[in-house]
Amino acid sequence: MIKIHLSRLLGAHRMTQAELSQKTGIRAATINEMYHELIERVNLDYLSRICEVLGCKVEDILEYVPDSYKMQYRADRQN
C-alpha cells in the first residue's frame, strides 16, 4: 500500500488544497483525491510540480507500507 502525506505537508506549509491547485495547475479534484488518499494512480509530472511548490522530495509525499499493515491502517482511519 502507498500512503500519501499531502494533507500533512499542506498543513505544515499552511496551504489550502485550492492554493496548491492554483500554484501547480493540477485540477482541484485531483488534489482533493490525493489529499484524502483516494487516488489510484499518480501522474509523475504532478508529483514533480507538487515537490517544486512545496520544496519537498517525492519520499515526503509518498510512503510504502507493507500490505501486512493495510488492515490495521484501515481500521485506524475508520476510528
Model-found features: residue ranges?
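Hydrophobic micro-packing sites on short alpha-helices
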Residues: 46-51, 61-62
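Helix-turn-helix DNA-binding elements, focusing on the entry/boundary residues of the two helices
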Residues: 17, 44-47
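DNA major-groove recognition helix of helix-turn-helix
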Residues: 10, 35, 46, 65
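The alpha-helix within a helix-turn-helix
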Residues: 10, 21, 51
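Short, charged recognition helix plus adjacent turn
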Residues: 8, 62-79
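Short alpha-helical DNA-recognition segment
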Residues: 15-33
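A short, Lys/Arg-rich alpha-helix, primarily the initiator
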Residues: 1-16
